[in-house]
Curated annotation (Swiss-Prot):
Keywords: Autophagy, Cytoplasmic vesicle, Lipoprotein, Membrane, Protein transport, Transport, Ubl conjugation pathway, Vacuole. This is Autophagy-related protein 8. The record marks 116-117 as: Cleavage. SUPFAM superfamilies: Ubiquitin-like. A lipid is attached at residue 116 (Phosphatidylethanolamine amidated glycine). Disruption phenotype: Increases the rate of incompatibility cell death. It comes from Podospora anserina. Induction: Expression is positively regulated by idi-4. InterPro entries: Atg8-like (IPR004241), Ubiquitin-like_domsf (IPR029071). The C-terminal 5 residues may be removed to expose Gly-116 at the C-terminus. The C-terminal Gly is then amidated with phosphatidylethanolamine by an activating system similar to that for ubiquitin.
Length: 121
């Protein structure tokens, strides 16, 4: 999936920003979170997050649910490289495995399981 954030900000600027963030906040992960384009789920109010390294994927999903004011009965799926990461995985391990060459971790979310793949822990 194409990232609007990548389209709007040149690579060098993104890379410099991610490096600055990692130097200043070594225990945090720079994350860009965007909605899957064709999803009918609400659009999030901010794309950039500074996530504690010891946060789990499940806890991050909870943060996203709160930001988009998603009701409990509605489903949300998050994807990293078009794969559903394990809920219990730490954001730090997801970051190490999937960070972009610019230093950000790109996460997309949807109201439906758009891609269908699961990552095994």
């Amino acid at each position: 999936m194409r990232s609007k954030f990548k389209d709007e900000h040149p690579f060098e600027k993104r890379k410099a920003e991610a490096e600055r963030i990692r130097q200043k906040y070594a225990d945090r992960i720079p994350v860009i979170c965007e909605k899957v384009e064709k999803s009918d789920i609400a659009t999030i109010d901010k794309k950039k997050y500074l996530v504690p390294a010891d946060l789990t994927v499940g806890q991050f999903v909870y943060v996203i649910r709160k930001r988009i004011k998603l009701s409990p009965e509605k489903a949300i799926f998050i994807f990293v490289d078009e794969v559903l990461p394990p809920t219990a995985a730490l954001m730090s391990s997801i970051y190490e495995e999937h960070k972009d060459e610019d230093g950000f971790l790109y996460i997309t979310y949807s109201g439906e399981n758009t891609f269908g793949g699961f990552e095994t822990a």
